[in-house]
Amino acid sequence: MRRAELNVTDPARIAEILNKCDCCRVGFWDGEEVYLVPMSFGWEKAGGKYTLWFHGAGEGRKAALARQCPRVSFEMDCGHGLRGAEMACGFTTAYQCIMGTGRLVPAETAEDKQRGLDAVMAHYAPGQTWTFPQEMLERTNVYRLEAETLSCKVHP
């Protein structure tokens, strides 16, 4: 990272930013171009590693690319604010962002799917308990992204 003073490494601060973000963009490579998909997500941290969870249909471009090339990048951001100045060159934007790379793998078992969907729902509706019908678990793709790299930056 070029501006080391903007780098955030404190796990509590990273968790705070993860919780504030409401969309995670996942970048897939199809061999010719990047396909960027905004997705709802959930997350968890265990053993110092971050895991992101996503869900989606079992068909379509995203599902096909997840099978074809599971190495992906991701980005999420929040806390945006334009900072004006007297000169155009002085304008800047405040933001908080998290970026990284990892492998997107499908959850295979009903238990893994439940765990992933629980993480997604906990992100958007914390403190509530949800049940998912077996039929829904069977037809919903749930993906786990184990972050191999993760960086966090805050530009005040």
Regions found by a protein language model. Name each.
Residues M1-N19:
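Extreme N-terminal tail/first-helix region
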Residues R2-E5, G79-P156:
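Charged, gly/pro-rich active-site loop segments
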Residues V8-D10, K20-R25, P126-Q128:
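Short Pro/Gly-enriched beta-strand edge/turn motifs at strand-loop
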Residues L18, L65-A66, V120:
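A generic structural signal for nonpolar/aromatic side chains embedded in well-ordered alpha-helices
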Residues C21-G58:
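Short beta-strand segments
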Residues V26, R71-M76:
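Short conserved beta-strand and strand-loop elements enriched in small hydrophobics
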Residues Y50-V72:
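Compact nucleic-acid interaction/catalytic patches
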Residues R61, A66, D77, L82-G84:
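Cyclic nucleotide-binding regulatory domains
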